[in-house]
Amino acid sequence: MYQSSSSTSSSSQRSSLPGGGGLIRYGSAPGSFLNSVVDEVIGGGSSNARDFTGYQPSSDNFIGNFFTGAADSSSLRSDSTTCGVNNSSDGQKQLGNNNNNNSNKDIFLDRSYGGFNEISQQHKSNDIGGGNSSGSYSLARQRSSPADFFTYLASDKNNFSLNQPTSDYSPQGGSNGGRGHSRLKSQLSFTNHDSLARINEVNETPVHDGSGHSFSAASFGAATTDSWDDGSGSIGFTVTRPSKRSKDMDSGLFSQYSLPSDTSMNYMDNFMQLPEDSVPCKIRAKRGCATHPRSIAERERRTRISGKLKKLQDLVPNMDKQTSYSDMLDLAVQHIKGLQHQLQNLKKDQENCTCGCSEKPS
């Protein structure tokens, strides 16, 4: 994760040459996350502590001032990635002003960025060995990714273990156990304070109990820790515990998708055991279907009309059965009118009749 001893020595030799130059490598951590961490830890300090400028030919002195760390501040490094630093009195006198101005900031930045002090000490060795020549550009390598930092802390060779049920990372062993414990608790205590936005959708399901550490799948820290009792700028990744309503909803879903109980099975058996001649439910047919009530009524009406027209065909002579219903009705009307005219003529003939049959009996 950090520079090895061979790369450190090669870079120091390269920077000590009169025309040697190098490249500054920055880790691509989220800028907003790192800026917020620095602002919270420093407490609103100057923005020079996080002014990551790009590659500039004239920014050698500025980068030197930025990466100058406290000589006595301890940095998190493994046994194989230690960096040799020349702590001579001349080097301390040369960088005395920068150490006095930036000692507190470097300590806090060392807590926020894993190998910051290691990089600053490498830069001091480069300045002491080769001097600050105008033609050489100091090169530093910085890894500030939080994921790599957590991986570095979780390694076994650093004597740090993550076997506590809470998410507070604590050292177990090592030469600087007490100091590292306070540093890590001040840096990595993810508490339940309401400092960030809440996420109510995720429930708390503990996993990974047997892998050396246990944590909640909902957040980094679901248990309450007492590392920030004074309330001084804690970094809180919090998730609220599920409410009673969400628990009820989850239980309802579980009972919905689970197998039915014995009582429900018995009820379904009784419901399905129906008589053969009974209809469990009468479904109304759609419009236009043969079983729809209006369709049935229309069919009955047409059947009734067809029966009457058949009787009319028998009464009306010379009516072809292949004619339409309208023609049949016209012929029937004409036939009825003819019959009425004949009836009127017969009545007139009866009134004008003079025979004896027309006389009334006395």
UniProtKB/Swiss-Prot annotation:
One of its GO terms (molecular function) is transcription cis-regulatory region binding. The modification Phosphoserine is found at residue 189. Residues 1-23, 78-106, 120-140, 162-184 are annotated as: Disordered. It comes from the Eukaryota. Its main location: nucleus. The keyword Metal-binding does not apply. Residues 78-96, 162-173 have a biased composition (Polar residues). The keyword Magnesium does not apply. It is found in: Nucleus. One of its GO terms (biological process) is response to light stimulus. Residues 1-16 have a biased composition (Low complexity). Residues 289-339 form the bHLH domain. Keywords: DNA-binding, Nucleus, Phosphoprotein, Transcription, Transcription regulation. PROSITE patterns: BHLH. One of its GO terms (cellular component) is nucleus. Homodimer. This is Transcription factor bHLH128. The lineage of its organism: Eukaryota, Viridiplantae, Streptophyta, Embryophyta, Tracheophyta. The gene is BHLH128.
